[in-house]
Amino acid sequence: ALAFSMSVAHADSSLSTWSKQLFSRAAPAAPFASGASYRICFVPNGASCQDLLVNEINNTRRTLLIQAYSFTSAPIAAAVKRAKDRGVDVRVILDKSQVSQRYSSATFLRNAGIAVVIDTKPAIAHNKVMVFDNASVFTGSFNFTKSAQERNAENGFLVRGDDRIVRAYVDNWNERFRVST
């Protein structure tokens, strides 16, 4: 019984140490921001993530920051181009797989005069993020693809008016942009 108690105590201590190491880079917990709003989408059977994104892009006036693992959605790419055409500062970070992917929006976006860089440092740049006017953020499992909208079980989360969350995503976007080519 004593050996078992010592083993449990050791396991608890090891688990605590492991937990601290694992979560040391996580932001501290904080309450939702007063006045902030949150929207979610679940596809393929719930609210359209693609429509949510296109609407947010259409309402963007100053800056649009994008991080994408896979970006092949024609409606989303067209909305991004329209944003650029009306004077929005659009910048995009893509995973290296998008350089050779057959239907990637990378070439379309570059041809539209949009700054597109490739994040080659991690094994996979698996982010799916858009930051609109440094005021709202969309993130989730939703890749910016037709398959994500129509065939996959995906989710998205739009945070509007929570400056702390938006700032964290902008800071991360800037860091990924800094190390991309």
Regions found by a protein language model. Give the residues of each.
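Structural recognition of the beta-strand scaffold that forms the well-ordered cores
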Residues: C41, L65-Q67, R91-D95, V117-I118, ...
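Short, small/polar-rich loop/turn modules that mediate ligand/substrate recognition or access, typified
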Residues: A1-P44, Q50-D51, Q98-S100, N174-T181
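Primarily the HKD phosphodiesterase
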Residues: N55-A115
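Extracellular/periplasmic catalytic domains that process cell-envelope and extracellular macromolecules
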Residues: A33-S34, I57-N59, D85, L109-R110, ...
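Short, structured motif recognition centered on aromatic/hydrophobic residues
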Residues: Y69, V129, Y169
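Solvent-exposed loop/turn segments at secondary-structure junctions
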Residues: S70-A74, K96-S100, P122-A125, S136-V137, ...
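DNA replication sliding-clamp ring fold and its partner-interaction surfaces
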Residues: L52, E56-R62, I165-R167, W173
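Signature of lipid phosphatidyltransferase scaffolds
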Residues: S136-T181
